[in-house]
From Swiss-Prot:
<dbReference type="GO" id="GO:0051260">
    <property type="term" value="P:protein homooligomerization"/>
</dbReference>
<feature type="binding site">
    <location>
        <position position="64"/>
    </location>
    <ligand>
        <name>D-galactose 2</name>
    </ligand>
</feature>
<dbReference type="GO" id="GO:0140460">
    <property type="term" value="P:response to Gram-negative bacterium"/>
</dbReference>
<feature type="glycosylation site" description="N-linked (GlcNAc...) asparagine">
    <location>
        <position position="26"/>
    </location>
</feature>
<feature type="binding site">
    <location>
        <begin position="127"/>
        <end position="129"/>
    </location>
    <ligand>
        <name>D-galactose 3</name>
    </ligand>
</feature>
<dbReference type="GO" id="GO:0050832">
    <property type="term" value="P:defense response to fungus"/>
</dbReference>
<feature type="binding site">
    <location>
        <position position="108"/>
    </location>
    <ligand>
        <name>D-galactose 3</name>
    </ligand>
</feature>
<dbReference type="GO" id="GO:0098630">
    <property type="term" value="P:aggregation of unicellular organisms"/>
</dbReference>
<feature type="binding site">
    <location>
        <position position="67"/>
    </location>
    <ligand>
        <name>D-galactose 2</name>
    </ligand>
</feature>
<keyword id="KW-0348">Hemagglutinin</keyword>
<comment type="subunit">
    <text>Oligomerizes in solution.</text>
</comment>
<keyword id="KW-0430">Lectin</keyword>
<comment type="function">
    <text>D-galactose-binding lectin. Binds both alpha and beta anomer of galactose (Gal). Binds strongly to branched beta-Gal-terminated glycans and weakly to unbranched glycans with alpha-Gal on the end of chains. Has strong affinity for both Gal and GalNAc. Binds glycoproteins containing mucin-type chains. Has hemagglutinating activity towards human group A erythrocytes. Has hemagglutinating activity towards rabbit erythrocytes. Agglutinates V.proteolyticus bacteria.</text>
</comment>
<dbReference type="GO" id="GO:0050830">
    <property type="term" value="P:defense response to Gram-positive bacterium"/>
</dbReference>
<feature type="binding site">
    <location>
        <begin position="35"/>
        <end position="37"/>
    </location>
    <ligand>
        <name>D-galactose 1</name>
    </ligand>
</feature>
<dbReference type="GO" id="GO:0034117">
    <property type="term" value="P:erythrocyte aggregation"/>
</dbReference>
<keyword id="KW-0325">Glycoprotein</keyword>
Length: 150
């Protein structure tokens, strides 16, 4: 299973559990931050050929929209939680560099900024634009994309 960092393409910041702990509690917000460390590594956990869980390696918790709804509202915070269900499934669109929730919305920096500050929350939103592009990169080389569906 490939380990990767989730990099906000426009700002170069990365997904982190808020507070940066290795075992954050259920419901911990996911934020963007410029630091790189082993507590912000992720992996895909395959469910079927398209949909996957995004797993926080250190805690083995899964990326979820807060509340775990099938069709989260625009602005719903992204969090880590231990539960695995179809409302926590995501797919990567490598052509457009976005992360799509099974309900159809995408992960965005809250506020839609191309250069969000450290600690900016990540949310679900239906809009598509350059500020919501993410790429998966190697923890050993933050400029090298990794093949995460292999």
């Amino acid at each position: 299973m490939t380990t990767f960092l989730i990099k906000h393409k426009a700002s170069g910041k990365y997904f982190h559990p808020k507070g940066g702990t290795s075992n954050p509690p259920n419901g911990t917000n996911l934020v963007l931050h410029s630091d790189i460390h082993e507590r912000m590594y992720f992996q895909f956990e395959v469910v079927n050929e398209r949909w996957r869980y995004i797993k926080h390696v250190a805690s083995e918790k899964i990326v979820h929209p807060f509340g775990g709804k099938a069709d989260p509202l625009n602005g719903t915070n992204m969090v880590l939680h231990q539960d695995r269900h179809d409302r926590a499934l995501f797919a990567m669109d490598f052509f457009n560099d976005n992360i799509r929730h099974k309900g159809g919305k995408y992960i965005h920096p809250k506020g839609g900024s191309k250069n969000p500050s450290n600690g900016n929350l990540t949310v679900m939103h239906g809009d598509e634009h350059g500020a919501m592009e993410f790429i998966f990169v190697s923890p050993k080389n933050k400029d090298k994309r990794v093949l995460v569906y292999a």
